[in-house]
Amino acid sequence: MSKIVVVGANHAGTACIKTMLTNYGDANEIVVFDQNSNISFLGCGMALWIGEQIAGPEGLFYSDKEELESLGAKVYMESPVQSIDYDAKTVTALVDGKNHVETYDKLIFATGSQPILPPIKGAEIKEGSLEFEATLENLQFVKLYQNSADVIAKLENKDIKRVAVVGAGYIGVELAEAFQRKGKEVVLIDVVDTCLAGYYDRDLTDLMAKNMEEHGIQLAFGETVKEVAGNGKVEKIITDKNEYDVDMVILAVGFRPNTTLGNGKIDLFRNGAFLVNKRQETSIPGVYAIGDCATIYDNATRDTNYIALASNAVRTGIVAAHNACGTDLEGIGVQGSNGISIYGLHMVSTGLTLEKAKRLGFDAAVTEYTDNQKPEFIEHGNFPVTIKIVYDKDSRRILGAQMAAREDMSMGIHMFSLAIQEGVTIEKLALTDIFFLPHFNKPYNYITMAALGAKD
């Protein structure tokens, strides 16, 4: 029997553990260490909880220690791993306040990521805090269930009237909406001059920016935060251009991979993530890394990349589980497919934006089209959809796609995700069999029309 130690039990770790136990039973001994008090919190639901769009956090968990142990794992919660001896193959963790040494045959890192702490005066985390507790009251980081619960409790204080959200990526934009729905004044700050810049081209980010402004969110794009000021608690946030009187500051500038346990022994990617192959194996044989702490193969760029998404965490966990248990399995790569819904504006994307494709050296072009989902004689449930398809002019290969609408058209992006994965050309997409029925779409579907419009 082989002993497999898993460090971390959130999305990637949970998927990995369940895959090993349900597919290989008691063929292996599975031991798990996690520094948190809970597992499987769906951080994507944090904004829904804060904005009172769901009743409470109970549905944001899908597994727990008891379930994993019922399947056969030994799980140590609130037990941070202190060190790893890769030669002796031992893991030392702090269990109930005492050092606990566990041997292993295979090791799987699912250590995730942690919030980026930007060089901002006044923005500091308390020494030794595992829950990203700031030294300044009402300066909040967003990662764990505990962070969300803390923010929600503080929002009951009627003195907190104005909130600044720093970072206009997915999390920042969702939280800005949530605080406004909660009745707070909101200012959204980002050093870039738009929002969601990593996922959409400028015309669609402008659409989202206008959407937020129409709902009362103050946008402060193109501003660099210099200081969070206050006497013991947040009182104002200072940028290179303005000062804003606020009662709470949320830092949502992104996450960095948590790879400190590599201890200089494991090869790292340029951003510090564990560098892995398609089996999720690191540079040390028998040591795997999954989820936000690891790299992943990007089918759009056809190269190794870092794309921190819960969907990727689950897939990498499954791949590592089979390999650690002796079944040779390679991941097929990802496209970074994602989506967002703010005040009823739905946007989805996959692969590369035009701007990013050009920055990476592709001779890229875009074809775009806006049309109603259904024929005009369908008077109800009809809505306009905007689509953009990015492709390489040399190979004609589809590199990315973006869609926006006021109704749910999200399933369409999966076609483009598969197209990027399989190297489909823009010409082949134009001839793809897309059915027509007026209840659903037009004879010339907007996907077909956009593909036919590719002239370069």
From Swiss-Prot:
Cofactor: FAD
Superkingdom per UniProt: Bacteria
Protein residues bound to NAD(+): 171, 190, 199, 254, 308, 339
Uppermost EC category: oxidoreductase
Catalytic activity reported: 2 NADH + O2 + 2 H(+) = 2 NAD(+) + 2 H2O
Gene3D superfamilies, A to Z: 3.30.390.30, FAD/NAD(P)-binding domain
SUPFAM superfamilies attached to this UniProt entry: FAD/NAD(P)-binding domain, FAD/NAD-linked reductases, dimerisation (C-terminal) domain
Swiss-Prot/TrEMBL keywords: FAD, Flavoprotein, NAD, Oxidation, Oxidoreductase, Redox-active center
Active site: 11, 44
GO MF, one example: NADH dehydrogenase (ubiquinone) activity
Keyword check for Hydrolase: no
EC number: 1.6.3.4
Annotated binding of FAD, by residue: 10, 12, 34-35, 44, 81, 110, 113, 143, 170, 292, 309-311, 436
Record-linked InterPro entries: FAD-bd_OxRdtase, FAD/NAD-bd_sf, FAD/NAD-binding_dom, FAD/NAD-linked_Rdtase_dimer_sf, Pyr_nucl-diS_OxRdtase_dimer
Cysteine sulfinic acid (-SO2H) modified-residue sites: 44
Cofactor note: Binds 1 FAD per subunit.
Stored PANTHER family: NAD(P)H SULFUR OXIDOREDUCTASE (COA-DEPENDENT), PYRIDINE NUCLEOTIDE-DISULFIDE OXIDOREDUCTASE DOMAIN-CONTAINING
NCBIfam families reported for this sequence: NOXase_Strep (NF046103)
Function as written in the Swiss-Prot or TrEMBL entry: Catalyzes the four-electron reduction of molecular oxygen to water.
Family note: Belongs to the class-III pyridine nucleotide-disulfide oxidoreductase family.
Protein name: NADH oxidase
